[in-house]
Swiss-Prot record:
Protein name per Swiss-Prot or TrEMBL: Zinc finger protein ZIC 5
Subcellular localization: Nucleus
Organism of derivation: Xenopus laevis
Induction, per UniProt: By FGF-signaling. By snai1/snail. By zic1, zic2, zic3 and zic5.
Compositional bias segments (type: Basic and acidic residues): 506-515
């Protein structure tokens, strides 16, 4: 169909590989560089002359198919797409396709879209074809790919399903939030390949023998790139540790395991050998916990022939008090080494424990098991550990062993949680208090709007010189049993755990040295 454009354009016939196609040509003053390049590519007879500027990226010149031409639907934007597909595939127009057709039937030709489709690129739900601004740098792992190995294009009629080449690339118009999960732009070799029958829109992209970094520029007017634009702007180099995790949170761990730099640490054995007269620590260093534990077990603890099960770790709080069994000594040494060989088996938990009993108690938080029933008649309360049941028993006995330690306050409570709520009345946190919020309320017991007396100032001065652990003890409330001495309770004894878990808190203050 021949006609004349209302703006003074003219119709001319262009032969593309022997097939005559009607092409509308606007006046020379209105023709853009993009259309000139398109005409040059369409009429060029030599396969190595191309419009991309990269040798070897020209299209095949034989067995081409005529493109679907709609001259009457020419939009205002002259930078239309060069695509072998029909109008149903014209959702991503307005750009120049840099990817060569890897199959003879997928020949590139000039086409025009309606003004509605050329105003801005729209994400087609089943297309991942990149535009000229998707400047892709790929680094092939196989030498055959660098020698010209080709793969079928994404829109080729012949759907050959094979693995992606092992490469790394980023496409600014890739499907970051594709509904079907296809078209992943980052590291396709890391995740599982797509199921059969799904197009691989990233096949057939142009290969550049460049060993550079990855660069990408997102479309500023594309909706799915609003989230990605905060990660990489303009042509800045991308941080792989951040962007991979943002694009593929499920598969980033497999890649980041190889990206993390190993942290070098030295574990020092501080066991004091009693056979030496100097009584100096062993001081041998180890790079892994496994090596340190084996060293202590073999060299210091000894085998069944050892009758005295005493811990000689430097500055051990037991001060030479023996254990009744070897396994108890082994469990105690974990307080010093920091070993926790019992991980929680539930997915996503990640907690580890030094004692199997503590792991058993912890697993009840996942299973909901509460084997400890209240011993008082008429009460159906059940608990996951015995310590919680003990705290609950004070409700029935009317005992109030948890006293407020603030001077001038004689309040007492049956449960530590009630005392914690009461302490909020008295307490205010100083600026930058490290223990603030550790158990749900500020740690320093200073009355509100009450100036400190000289005696209180001296007490505060002395407590500030104490170690952090001693300071924490002074800042906690007093649990005073009837007719018993005053006992200071730390956070570990009030947590929802068994009394055997008190050893877990001491691991935080262990003598293990890490450099």
């Amino acid at each position: 169909m021949f006609g004349k454009d209302g703006r003074g354009g003219k119709i001319r016939t262009v032969s593309v590989d022997g097939l005559d196609c009607a092409l509308m040509e606007p006046p020379l003053s209105k023709r853009s560089q993009t259309l000139r390049l398109a005409d040059l590519a369409a009429t060029q007879a030599h396969p190595h002359h191309n419009m991309t500027g990269f040798p070897g990226l020209g299209s095949h010149q034989s067995h081409s198919l005529p493109a679907h031409m709609h001259p009457g639907e020419l939009g205002s934007d002259p930078g239309v797409a060069l695509t072998p597909f029909g109008p149903e595939h014209m959702a991503q127009a307005t750009a120049l396709k840099l990817s060569p057709s890897a199959h003879p039937e997928a020949q590139t030709a000039a086409a025009f879209a309606s003004p509605a489709t050329v105003s801005y690129p729209v994400a087609h739900p089943h297309s991942g074809y990149s535009t000229s601004r998707d400047f892709i740098l790929r680094r092939e792992l196989s030498t055959s790919a660098m020698l010209g190995e080709q793969h079928p294009a994404a829109g080729s009629p012949h759907h050959h399903h094979h693995h992606h080449p092992h490469s790394m690339f980023i496409s600014s118009t890739g499907s970051y939030a594709h509904p079907e999960g296809v078209g992943h732009p980052l590291f396709p070799a890391i995740h599982e390949q797509a199921a059969a029958g799904v197009h691989h829109p990233l096949n057939g992209q142009m290969r550049l023998g460049l060993a550079g970094e990855l660069y990408g520029r997102p479309e500023a007017f594309r909706a799915e790139h609003y989230a990605a634009s905060s990660l990489h702007h303009s042509y800045n180099s991308m941080n792989l540790n951040v962007n991979i995790a943002a694009a593929h949170p499920a598969t980033a761990g497999a890649f980041l395991r190889y990206m993390r730099q190993p942290i070098k640490q030295e574990l020092i054995c501080k066991w004091i050998d009693q056979d030496q007269s100097s009584k100096k620590p062993c001081s041998k260093t180890f790079s892994t916990m496994h090596e340190l534990v084996n060293h202590v077990a073999v060299e210091h603890v000894g085998g069944p022939e050892q009758s005295n099960h005493i811990c000689f770790w430097e500055e051990c709080a037991r001060e030479g008090k023996p254990f009744k069994a070897k396994y108890k000594l082994v469990n105690h040494i974990r307080v010093h080494t920091g070993e926790k060989p019992f991980p929680c088996p539930f997915p996503g938990c990640g907690k580890v424990f030094a004692r199997s009993e503590n792991l058993k108690i912890h697993k009840r938080t996942h299973t909901g098991e509460k084997p400890f029933k209240c011993e008082f008649d008429g009460c159906d309360r059940k608990f996951a550990n015995s310590s919680d049941r003990k705290k609950h028993s004070h409700v029935h006995t009317s005992d109030k062993p948890y006293y407020c330690k603030v001077r001038g306050c004689d309040k007492s409570y049956t449960h530590p949680s009630s005392l914690r709520k009461h302490m909020k009345i008295h307490c205010k946190s100083p600026p930058g208090s490290p223990t603030n919020g550790s158990m749900g309320y500020p740690a320093v017991g200073t009355p509100l709007d009450d100036p400190l007396s000289p005696a209180q100032e001296q007490v505060r001065g002395r407590s500030s010189n104490l170690s952090p652990q001693v300071t924490n003890l002074n800042e906690w409330y007093v649990c005073q049993a009837t007719g018993a001495t005053v006992n200071m309770h730390t956070a570990s004894s009030n947590a929802d755990s068994s009394e055997s878990e008190d050893d877990e808190e001491t691991y935080r203050h262990s003598e293990r040295t890490i450099r």
